[in-house]
Amino acid sequence: SSFEQLVELGKGNRQFDANDQHIIHIVDWLWQYAFDQRASDIHIEPRRDLGIVRFRIDGVLHQVYQIPMAVMNAMTSRIKLLGRMDVIEKRRPQDGRVKTRTPAGQEVELRLSTLPTAFGEKLVMRIFDPEVLVRDLRSLGFSSDDQVRWQQMTTTPNGIVLVTGPTGSGKTTTLYTTLK
């Protein structure tokens, strides 16, 4: 694939930076491929001597590529730059976000988080499709009674509603749907 060809160019002792054309193309291609595969997350993880790219599809992580460390580090820097994160800081977790478009031209938001590991910086990108975010409460699994209770809680003039749950459980989707 073109991704493998782009990564091939990245082999050898050459150093890359976040604005290198090859790196820009690799990141763009990776995102488009993730959208095509209907991935919900993209993981870029350092190992002892190479980088691993994994996609979460239907809740399961699949290894997609192995890439040279120099390419992986430059990709991570490129994505951090786009997410307005501190590119230099690699020893502390960071969060950011990037808006981009699918091949069909629809806007998608990526939530970024980095985490230091023994072998370098791990980057996880969660893909948010605004089309998927706005649904109705019934399609989110709310019973009729729950819908009524939720409506009452979220339209009260004062108070606080705390929405918690594990990653991917639908917190953001529930809140977007409520605001709609």
Where are these regions (language model features)?
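N-terminal "pre-motor" subdomain/linker immediately upstream of P-loop NTPase catalytic cores
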Residues: 1-166
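Conserved glycine(s) of the Walker
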Residues: 170
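Hydrophobic positions on the alpha1 helix immediately C-terminal to the Walker A/P-loop
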Residues: 174-178
